[in-house]
Amino acid sequence: MKKLILSTAITCLSLAHVHAQQGGATETTPSRSEYFSWINNTNEGATAEQTRINLDFFRWLHDKYGMELDIYAFDAGAIDGAKMYGSTKSDRFKRQFPEGFGPLSRQAADMNTRLGIWCGPDGFGNSEAEAKDRADMMTGLVKDHNFGLFKMDAVCGQLRKDKYEPFDSMMTEIRRLSPDFVLLNHRLDLGPGTRHSTTFLLGGEETYIDVFMTNSMTAPHHRAQAISRKAPENLTRLTEDHGVCLSSCLDYWEDDLILQSFGRELILAPEIYANPWFLRDEEFPYLAFIFNLHRTYRDILVNALRLPEESYGPEALSRGDDGTRFLTLRNLSWQPVTYKIKLDSETGIIDNGKKVKARLYHPYIYDLGSHNYGDIIEVEVLPFRAALVKLTTQPEKDKVALSGIPYHIINDKAGDDVEIKLLGMPGQTYKVKAEKGNAHFASAQINGNAANALARGGSARVSFPGKPFKEFYHRLIDRMQSCDIPADAPSLYYATCYAADNNALEVRSLARSGETEIPQVKAARDAFTEQEIFRARDLWDRYLFDGDESTCFSVKLRHGDRRAGNTSALYLDLGKSVKLDELVFKAPDEYAIAPYKSQEGALLWLSDNLVDWKPITFIVGTKAVADTRDAGEFRYVRLSDSPLRLSEIEGWRDGKAVDRSKWHASNLFREYNRGGCKTRHAWKSEFTLDEFADGAYLCVALNGHHGREGAWAAMKVDGRYVGCPDRAPSFTSNTWEHLNVETDSNNTYYIPLTPDMLGKKLEVYALSFESPDLKPEVW
């Protein structure tokens, strides 16, 4: 018997013509959902075992939430790689896939998923035999393993003109085998074979946040630029936008995916890549919800209508048919925006004599009522967020449709029971009513308590604990005022150096997500962090404290020395004040300790409060021991020049190694007063907060031009220094792939608010090392 299961969660919210199919699809072909593995691996390529684990993750989403994935695509390195062509007969391929693609294609097929692969357009060699081998291999992927997609990329190389004919012939055979085969063309001239291309890369943009796509404006999160992306001018769907990257800077990924799936809604949608297993456990139901909602309506989402920007905001679109439309709205400003939505032909709805039902589907589901055709309703969109609104005159497709309260669907596809999370503000009571859905239930419960009236179409009252907020949780607190350079400017600077880190962006995502209780998620995360190439790139400060001298943490120089001022210090935070007899620094070789040389003296700086620093002289070497027994208690350690590469940092007390589980280090931030890092202008804001929501944070928006790494922010709480652990664009990092984007304007620093800050005097500072023309604000 079906059961309706509801749980409550306090939240902060505001209501608010067919052509020949030469390329495998037409403008009216429904989208296919895709994941591709770029950033899960880089040009070294995937392996069979890692792919098996990743497919297990998607099988879990399929079985748990009913999520359908049409295509799982290997990215670079599986066969072809950057500037090279490969073969399934090569030793390299056999090392990566000892049993070939067969087991993986069968594993994918068990959940109705087809494999795809990144490749180059050529590889036909210089003889007829070599050309035949290439064509047979690529055709065999489709014939023998039911591959459904090739992503052909100029990174591998262009197609030679004398190979136009074998390419065209190969793709003609593939189209015969699989008429719906998808060929993605990334920056390639394929000659006559261009007719086989399904899509072309939209704007040439990749979407790896803060590597290839980063904010150009101040914003409360890292994905403001991503949600600013435009749809193709002619609303073509036969292009590819590189999907949504789930690897770095994950907050508000769902807005990004809503706009990709329901806004641009290209032939590949929803399209994600990299490391979706980095999401928090509680976010996976929403990932599945977006995929499932899109799949339910994908046949009609192919029809698009631009909405007037003056009424509906930037890049607003309506998709659907005469009876059902989905509107994607966005707000690219710091204040909430209310849009007036006309329930008529302006939004694509055609009058059939029935009421128009309006329902918000993102950022949560909320019933907006039934209205007469031609009415106008208002929908509020939160700052730097997206909204998805459904208008329909048709019967409800949702199994459950509630009114009176915002909610998320946790699971309505797998199994008989439907699970809903009710959302509410602290101290508020809601009257929840079950509207007519397309399923019938024998019972209902809220937080384990019977609420069977809901199953019969009745109502229930739901109250949320806590006190109602006096003010809207998102608000401007202050426009910061210019002030004298504070005497403790170095301490403020160091507070953020110690609060932040230089780990790979993926490591930061793991820290955001916390531990998982889902075996398939843990396996996929571990498969990523334990892959040999990730460990070998020295991207994680954890390697300094793991007791394994074969792992290291290094200053990344692969793309040259990109440190501000070409200098950086080593910062070590012990997590709490301690007394130690010795600090031991280990390096793998003499080169690694540069710019130091063995048997030279150096100074180590120790502090308990970021104000008073005690120098300790020690002798440099591949194993350097600093005697700290007379230093008293300290928490913060600073070495003016960071060694290029360290394998371990140890602490000893009474002959025993101390616990280092709370230690962390960074190696890319300058020391104050070096490399141009000196405060020339300052701004301050002082205030007290008597209320804020759980998970709240301050945004210090540095509006204006400040130069590359030319401005900083931090806070004092009743005199205690509190740094910013995050910033958009991201703090410089030892990146997993490519490099951090560098910007010289409009950085936004983030400071988490904790319960101990309530009622305390908060002093927020912005420090500029260059420009006096900033207009900082605190939100």
Say what each PLM segment does.
Residues 311-317, 554-577, 588, 675-691, ...:
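Short beta-strands within extracellular/lumenal beta-sheet-rich domains
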Residues 171-172, 177-366, 372, 376-388:
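Active-site-proximal substrate-binding groove within the catalytic cores of carbohydrate-active enzymes
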Residues 303-324, 395-428, 666-691:
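Surface beta-strand/loop "capping" patches
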Residues 7-14:
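Bacterial N-terminal signal peptides
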Residues 322, 329-527, 532, 536-550, ...:
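C-terminal beta-sandwich/jelly-roll accessory domains of carbohydrate-active enzymes
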Residues 68-254, 648:
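Aromatic- and carboxylate-enriched substrate-binding clefts and catalytic-loop regions
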Residues 21-116, 122, 268, 274-309, ...:
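Conserved structural scaffold segments of CAZyme catalytic domains across common CAZy folds
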Residues 20, 548-612, 626-671, 699-705, ...:
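Aromatic, loop-rich ligand-recognition surfaces of beta-strand-rich domains
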